[in-house]
């Protein structure tokens, strides 16, 4: 039951991750053995639901890689279901201010600390009430990562960092660059300056900074600045580009692909 991902962040040990968008338990298990510290199961932009998240959690469970789940929104009903199927670490998208960060934390806590509904007899998370004192232990093992993706969220970062129960803050470079007027160009100097400043600010607050970036030089730069959970690739991108490269080596004419954010 111990959340080893949360423990690693608290100890200041950088965690390298991979984004999962294929929504497949088979590919999730394949990648769980690849050596990444954590795997992000994406419920915001990938075609996932509670059932597909569950099967991926089950597939990853025997491996050292730790699952992180991103719901589609900061929704306590959806979060409750994801926690009951066994999610312990959440990446909550589009958090704009401290109140929204507090709502995310409260959704992960049983009363009186929060509003999570008690249904442990039905829940994989408690192993159907086979984990002794699950209801007393669960709150402390929840890891809440909130995602800042706009100029407004950046402005409110100091207040977000003050919210008790927020373990880390993840910078979303794609949406942030779009909000700053540089859609598709997170490497623009102004965007990079904002990202770097935020990483330093988050780390100095005692929280864990995180980001997704497929550029290896930038990933290493962010780690040097103090980022503690960094996703360095996306399964869909890795599969698509590798397949195109293989076909091209045998003379196939692939559709030209404009380099993406990830």
Curated annotation (Swiss-Prot):
Transmembrane parts of this sequence: none
Residues holding a divalent metal cation: 149, 175
Protein name, UniProt field: 4-hydroxy-2-oxo-heptane-1,7-dioate aldolase
Subunit structure comment from the entry: Homohexamer; trimer of dimers.
Pathway recorded for this protein: Aromatic compound metabolism; 4-hydroxyphenylacetate degradation; pyruvate and succinate semialdehyde from 4-hydroxyphenylacetate: step 7/7
Residues flagged as site, Transition state stabilizer: 70
Outcome recorded upon mutating residue 70 to A: Loss of activity. Still able to bind pyruvate
Gene3D superfamilies referenced in this protein's UniProt entry, alphabetically: Phosphoenolpyruvate-binding domains (3.20.20.60)
Cofactor binding, per record: Binds 1 divalent metal cation per subunit. Has the highest activity with Co(2+) and Mn(2+), but can also use Zn(2+), Fe(2+) and Mg(2+).
Misc. remarks from the entry: The aldol addition reaction proceeds via a rapid equilibrium random order mechanism.
Classification of source organism: Bacteria, Pseudomonadati, Pseudomonadota, Gammaproteobacteria, Enterobacterales
């Amino acid at each position: 039951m111990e959340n080893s991902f949360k423990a690693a962040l608290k100890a200041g040990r950088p965690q390298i991750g991979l984004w999962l968008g294929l929504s497949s338990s088979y590919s999730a298990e394949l990648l769980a053995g690849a050596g990444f510290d954590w795997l992000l199961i994406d419920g915001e932009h990938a075609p996932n639901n509670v059932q597909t998240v569950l099967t991926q959690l089950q597939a990853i469970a025997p491996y050292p890689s730790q699952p992180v789940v991103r719901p589609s929104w900061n929704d306590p009903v959806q979060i409750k279901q994801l926690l009951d199927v066994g999610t312990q670490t959440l990446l909550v998208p589009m958090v704009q201010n401290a109140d929204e960060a507090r709502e995310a934390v409260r959704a992960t806590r049983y009363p009186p600390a929060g509003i999570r509904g008690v249904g442990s007899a039905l829940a994989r998370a408690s192993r159907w009430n086979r984990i002794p004192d699950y209801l007393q232990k669960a709150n402390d093992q929840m890891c809440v990562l909130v995602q800042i993706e706009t100029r407004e969220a950046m402005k409110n970062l100091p207040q977000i960092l003050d919210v008790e129960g927020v373990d880390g803050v993840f910078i979303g470079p794609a949406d942030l660059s779009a909000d700053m007027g540089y859609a598709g160009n997170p490497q623009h100097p102004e965007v990079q300056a904002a990202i770097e400043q935020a990483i330093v600010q988050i780390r100095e607050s005692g929280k864990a900074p995180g980001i997704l970036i497929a550029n290896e030089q930038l990933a290493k730069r962010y780690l040097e600045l103090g980022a503690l959970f960094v996703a360095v690739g996306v399964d869909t991108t890795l599969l698509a580009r590798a397949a195109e490269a293989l076909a091209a080596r045998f003379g196939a004419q692939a559709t030209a692909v404009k380099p993406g954010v990830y």
